[in-house]
Amino acid sequence: MIRGAATLACALAWSLSAAAMVGGAQPADDGAGRSAVMLTGSRGTFCSGVALARDLVLTAAHCVLPGADYKLVELDAARQPALKDLATIVRHPEFDVTAVLRHRVTADVALLKLAAPVKNVPAPLAPPGGAVAVGDSFMVAGYGLAVRGDGKTGGTVRAAALVATGQPGSLQIRLTDPASKGERAGLGACTGDSGAPVFRDINGALAVIGIVSWSTGPGNSEGCGGLTGVTPLARYLGWIIEQAGKLGSRLP
């Protein structure tokens, strides 16, 4: 049972969002950033996501909890925002919001059918298989804060190269800045980066292997710039493909 969905949504957005790249990550309007989108909620929350089709977005389920209205934010060339309606929100049936709060494994994935197409370039999903080892490199792109606690630094898509640490597997992957190794503040997800795509280079092309679910500060403290927690998509690929078909969206 979801306790206080609106309050919980705010708590998740501000305490769990992976930092859309704190630590000096550079803007990334091309490459990985072309597929990243920004989402906002009526309770003051904001997250990232990734376009899988012109009319379909993948994000974290905890970004679109019941009890609020959500919009996709599209920026024009002058960085003026336009709010785009969502037609349908489909959360994975096995998602457990309390698990996200504890940084535990859960099906933290949701699909958003858009009322109208977006300009973003759809990103391909990584095929199943391909084990993840410590030190493997990934690219994360999101709209989160560049400086923790400074809301003015959010809203620009930034990308950061992070590496796997700990014991990566099919249930959860933890990423860190290879320069700081989580021991001091470095690159990583922050507020507004939840739902951001995590890319892996597969045969010279970037493909989405997971999405951001949470972040920590250095030394596993609260905050950003330490660990970036990723929900791998391999075990949910069948569900994503099935739901995309039901929603009438064609995946690349």
Enumerate the language-model features and the residues they cover.
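Positively charged n-region of N-terminal signal peptides that target proteins for export
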Residues: 1-4
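Surface-exposed patches in mature extracellular/periplasmic domains of secreted proteins
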Residues: 99, 123-124, 248-252
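Soluble periplasmic/extracytoplasmic beta-strand elements of cell-envelope proteins
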Residues: 38, 58, 71, 109-113, ...
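C-terminal subregion of chymotrypsin/trypsin-like serine protease catalytic domains
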Residues: 28-35, 41, 45-46, 51-65, ...
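Bacterial N-terminal signal peptides
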Residues: 7-18
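Conserved catalytic-core segment of clan PA serine endopeptidases
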Residues: 22-31, 70-120, 127-130, 152
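Chymotrypsin/trypsin-fold serine protease catalytic domain
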Residues: 106-109, 114-186, 226-227, 233-238
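Glycine-centered low-complexity coil/loop motifs and glycine-rich tracts
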Residues: 187-191
